[in-house]
């Protein structure tokens, strides 16, 4: 059992907390990860731009940011993985540009962010990028097929 905390700062009805929680559960299940706490924040471009500027020195919006914590406080049931922040407007625009349904782009960004929390990094080397993106694609296809079968989510 995992603890998934979702903070949705926008009224975008096409991306529900239920959908995000279910997607995160499926991602963690695919990775055989249990008893973790993860925080997902769904926000706007100006908020993610400010976070990106403050923490990465990049004064521009982005699709997803990850902040790994990876600690297990004494007597706390869960290992805390960290926080994933996604800009919904950025994701929607990006989905349109690459020809992916909006909800599938959110799934892709959740996978990407969670992999970063687990220590994967596509910016360190080409080999690490290959490993990360290969795993990301594998998980995406698995989760995508699950959600295509359960379109009532």
From Swiss-Prot:
Zn(2+) binds at residues 112, 116, 122. GO terms for biological process: rRNA processing. Its cofactor is Zn(2+). Pfam families: YbeY. GO terms for molecular function: metalloendopeptidase activity; RNA endonuclease activity; zinc ion binding. GO terms for cellular component: cytoplasm. It is an enzyme of class 3 (hydrolase). The keyword Kinase does not apply. Binds 1 zinc ion. InterPro entries: MetalPrtase_cat_dom_sf_prd (IPR023091), YbeY (IPR002036), YbeY_CS (IPR020549). Its EC number is 3.1.-.-. It is found in: Cytoplasm. Keywords: Cytoplasm, Endonuclease, Hydrolase, Metal-binding, Nuclease, Ribosome biogenesis, rRNA processing, Zinc. NCBIfam families: rRNA maturation RNase YbeY. Belongs to the endoribonuclease YbeY family. Single strand-specific metallo-endoribonuclease involved in late-stage 70S ribosome quality control and in maturation of the 3' terminus of the 16S rRNA. This is Endoribonuclease YbeY. The gene is ybeY.
């Amino acid at each position: 059992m995992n603890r998934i905390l979702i903070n949705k700062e926008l009224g975008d009805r096409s991306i529900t907390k239920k959908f995000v929680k279910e997607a995160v559960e499926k991602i963690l299940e695919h990775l055989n990860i249990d008893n973790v706490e993860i925080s997902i924040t769904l926000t706007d471009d100006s908020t993610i731009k400010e976070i990106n500027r403050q923490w990465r020195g990049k004064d521009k919006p982005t699709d997803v940011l990850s902040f790994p914590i990876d600690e297990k406080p004494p007597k706390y049931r869960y290992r805390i993985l960290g926080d994933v922040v996604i800009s919904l407007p950025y994701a929607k625009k990006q989905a349109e540009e690459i020809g992916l349904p909006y909800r599938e782009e959110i799934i892709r960004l959740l996978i990407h962010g969670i992999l970063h929390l687990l220590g994967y990094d596509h910016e360190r080397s080409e080999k690490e990028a290959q490993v990360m993106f290969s795993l990301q694609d594998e998980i995406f296809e698995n989760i995508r097929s699950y959600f295509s079968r359960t379109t009532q989510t």
